[in-house]
Amino acid sequence: MDLRPLVLALGVSAACRGREATPQARYEARVFAGGVAPPAGAPQAGKNPFRGDRQSAVEGERTFGVMNCDGCHGGGAVGWVGPSLRDGRWRYGGSDGEIFQSIYYGQPHGMPAYGGLLPPGAIWKLVTYLQSLEPPADVPTQSWK
């Protein structure tokens, strides 16, 4: 039996050991949804062309479900693994343009970039949906005692 392929595979495996990103580095890295990076020359977030449009909010809600946003942000965007998107506490800014940028380019610490999968119009409709959500009546706060 020829053991050369096995020896070669083990050698390559040993040579690659230790080159994996640390858990911290993987956590801080930007992640591209579906492995597809946003295209070069991506649009700058400006004014939301769908702001306040109810039908666009409905389409954005559909995108929220189809793209599995609720898998991290919970049903109705109330928060789960990812933060709540309806309590007014925006980590990277809560303006339409800032939310667009977060969805399009992603953010370190777990928010994938969807600019490679979704066209800008779909992202704006998702922003419209998120901005249409009412904040919960009982926003939990942290006690500093």
Language-model segment annotations:
Residues 76, 107, 133-137:
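A general structural signal marking secondary-structure boundaries and capping sites
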Residues 17-56, 66-67, 112-145:
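Flexible coil segments in periplasmic/lumen-exposed cytochrome c-class electron-transfer proteins
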Residues 8-10, 99:
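Intrinsic disorder/low-complexity segments
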Residues 51-62, 74-104, 110, 117:
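Gly/Gly-Pro-rich "capping" loops immediately C-terminal to redox-active cysteine motifs
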Residues 2-8:
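Sec-dependent signal peptide recognition
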Residues 13-15:
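C-terminal motif of bacterial Sec signal peptides marking the signal peptidase cleavage site
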Residues 10, 63-66:
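Processing junctions and N-termini across compartments
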Residues 69-72:
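Short cysteine clusters
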